[in-house]
């Protein structure tokens, strides 16, 4: 997916902020990326990770759900969503997401939920 220059620059800046531990700035920039480009899988996944690192678990879960909606056969997205659920204490949901990641690791596919 070709990113518009503004989104590409924002995403790079957000990655730099995340690397420096500037989580609030990273979250704001990732959020802006997905506002500008709602189908940007990497933006949603990165937003979820930054939200988790910030301790905002419900927000991380929402971003993670959006990522797996966009790419339901991405093993890392399901693994991340499972982690977000664990951090939020939602063990049943974490296990369900973890199973989907495991299925993908075995070469299976996950049906896109309607």
Question: Which residues does each PLM region occupy?
Answer:
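TPR-adjacent "capping" and linker segments in tetratricopeptide-repeat scaffold/adaptor proteins
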Residues: 1-9, 112-114
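Structural signature of tandem alpha-helical TPR/SEL1-like repeats
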Residues: 8, 13, 19-29, 54-66, ...
């Amino acid at each position: 997916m070709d990113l518009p220059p503004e989104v590409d620059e924002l995403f790079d800046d957000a990655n730099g902020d995340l690397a420096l531990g500037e989580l609030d700035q990273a979250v704001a920039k990732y959020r802006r990326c997905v506002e500008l480009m709602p189908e940007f899988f990497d933006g949603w996944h990165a937003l979820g990770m930054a939200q988790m690192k910030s301790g905002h678990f419900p927000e991380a879960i929402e971003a993670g759900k959006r990522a797996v909606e966009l790419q339901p056969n991405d093993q890392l997205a399901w693994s991340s969503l499972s982690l977000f659920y664990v951090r939020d204490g939602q063990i049943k949901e974490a296990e369900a997401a973890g199973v989907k990641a495991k299925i993908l690791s075995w070469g299976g596919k996950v049906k896109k939920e309607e």
